[in-house]
Amino acid sequence: MVFVNMNTSRPVSVDIHVLFFAKCRELSQTTRSVFTVPSEIRASDLLDKIVIQFGLTTIRHNLIIAHNESFVENLNDSIFLKDGDELAVIPPLSGG
Amino acid sequence: MNHIKLIDCPIDVTYAINLISDPSCGASSIFIGTTRDSFQGKKVVSLAYEAYENMALKEMDKICSDLRATWPDLKHILIYHRLGTVPENEASVVIAASAPHRSAALKAVTFAIDQLKSRVPIWKKEIYEGNHDAEWKENSESIRPKKSLSSFNYSVCKVDESRVVSRNLVQIRANDCELKNRVECFFKRKRAEINSCNVIDFKQSNLSSNINSDTEVDVSCARTQSTISKQEQSNCHLKVRRATNRCGPQQMQFRPEYKHELSRLTASRVSTNEVGESLQNSRLHSIETYMGLTSKNNENIINRIKNVENRILLLESTSPEYQHFFEQSCMDQPEKKIKTNKTYSAHELRVYIHRKNKECP
């Protein structure tokens, strides 16, 4: 007999759309890109991955992210991603 | 009504004022943000705005909801923001609000522009005259990365893998709140220990050597509440008239026997409740076993609960530093019960069955 433990779920990878604005857009030289990431990830880890992948290291400490058009207020929070989710990399705002 | 827009052409301020004016409103307030012509001595030629448009509109809508929640009197709210290239001295943002009275209108506009600068995803790039590089601006109010809400610094207590960890220590998963609570309990416990030591130190340091140890407790002046008054025709300036020690080590012997009192008070009640007792007992007993406590069944139930409570408090405030607590406790008992998760191959099982069959033909 073979027992399969259903509880040990391996992290599932999902494809998300990453959007870049302002200085991020200039540094990454793109406005949007598809990026494969684990479906559950700490916001700061996700940001680190993006920073490395898209060459944003010079401004990494000022970046925040918005998941499906809502700010992720605390980078220590875990976020749960689905295929096709929109993730915006947001440098310091300067509206007004 | 809420008027929210991101627009590519110049904002018509008169039109905006007309939009928010209302016969029922005695106040219209408007804020117009215009682009400055210079920055640190560099002449600004133009500004380029860009936005995360969907989210910007969402956030602007949120600002409107917040305004209405705070000032329910507001009639109309207008938030217009320019996108694309804006020549110097043109309006880049217009915020307006109307209300029956001026206070709500004025405050709402102030609040809205502060919120807009901190939360609405819009960016401005200043383009300067001459060879100066264009620059992305940053609002001081802008939302910034926050990382420190998790107050527990995990890096200060790295796990030393090489050390042999006591079997009594288990790894637990706990959230920040729980961890904080545990750390606080530990602090409290430490504090209590230090306090009790201090009391003893104080007592001893006040003792002169010729007083023998039996009287030590009585003569200690720790934790004294005294009334001092001058006596008539006294040679001494002051004389102690009365001293009361309500608490402190000197009073230990005068404390009522709580355990005894409790047993006396509850003895009758417990015995009348015999139907429920066996169930209570078995449940309490299993809790006690789990917590490594031993008790006799006929012991007073309140005392047993008290012991369990004490145990919980102890465990809650215990850190690895308190290993000696484990060592003297009887938590080592269930050692025998722990199973080894050995896996057997099909061959081993066959051999085992074969042997068993042989043993009992």
UniProtKB/Swiss-Prot annotation, chain B:
Organism: Drosophila pseudoobscura pseudoobscura
Protein name: Molybdopterin synthase catalytic subunit
One Gene Ontology term of the molecular function aspect: molybdopterin synthase activity
Gene: Mocs2B
Main location: cytoplasm
SUPFAM superfamilies for this protein: Molybdopterin synthase subunit MoaE
Top-level taxon: Eukaryota
Quaternary data: Heterotetramer; composed of 2 small (Mocs2A) and 2 large (Mocs2B) subunits.
Binding-site residues, substrate: H101, R102, K117, K124, K125, E126
Function of the protein: Catalytic subunit of the molybdopterin synthase complex, a complex that catalyzes the conversion of precursor Z into molybdopterin. Acts by mediating the incorporation of 2 sulfur atoms from thiocarboxylated Mocs2A into precursor Z to generate a dithiolene group.
